Amino acid sequence: MARKVLASGLAESLLLLGRIEFFDLRLPDSADTTFVRALQAAGEADDNLLGAAILAHSAFVPGWAGHLDGARERMHAARTYARRAPVSADVLAWLDAVEAECLTRCGDHRGALALLRHAEDVLAADSDILPPDWFTWFSTTRLHAFRGNTELRAGLIPQARTTLEQTLSELPQTDGKQRIVVLGDLASVEAAARRPEQACALLEQALDQLAITWYATGMERVREARRALTPWQDTAAVRRVDDRLYSWSTTLSSLQR
């Protein structure tokens, strides 16, 4: 029993480390290795639900690299592990959201949106099963953030704006990392709508938050939005963003991490 408790604690710690490596630092290879170690510890603990969470996180690695088959295989494994344990609606919806993000990154926007609608239905249904204590990274608001990004990448600009503005209004001020991501996506929405000044205002808000809380995934979204502003790169608003995006501190943070 003591061995299982220790193994469970180790698996949770390694999962957190893998999340930091993948999302905060954008070190996918290191994260992939850490997720394997986390899965080994979850196996020692015989914790199927923790194993499902680790496998789903590991699906981000091939999914974000555009390798759909690898992501699907890992998601199938994650869902198989989840079926072996009592599972809450929150966890089931999150599994849908993870797979949807992988599909989005691989260009299957229709499939991703279908999964996100299913996740919303799952969350809306009653469930007596509570999520485990370590499951702290997902909520209805986070699901909306997933959907807004998919709508953006699918070219559904009005829908993406509505979804992301709602998400931003619901996010607590303390959730700085997610706010950076949503602000970056909203800036991309405004750039796609040919509203460069509004996009720049959102990017400046994102850069304000990045100065407080560095988040490599958030910086990626900021850079994506800035690339979308290339047609207006000689305007004063875009140059102000560039002056901040390529300040000494921001440039050094990007290179060091």
Q: Predicted regions: what is each one?
A:
Residues 1-257:
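Conserved binding/catalytic microenvironments
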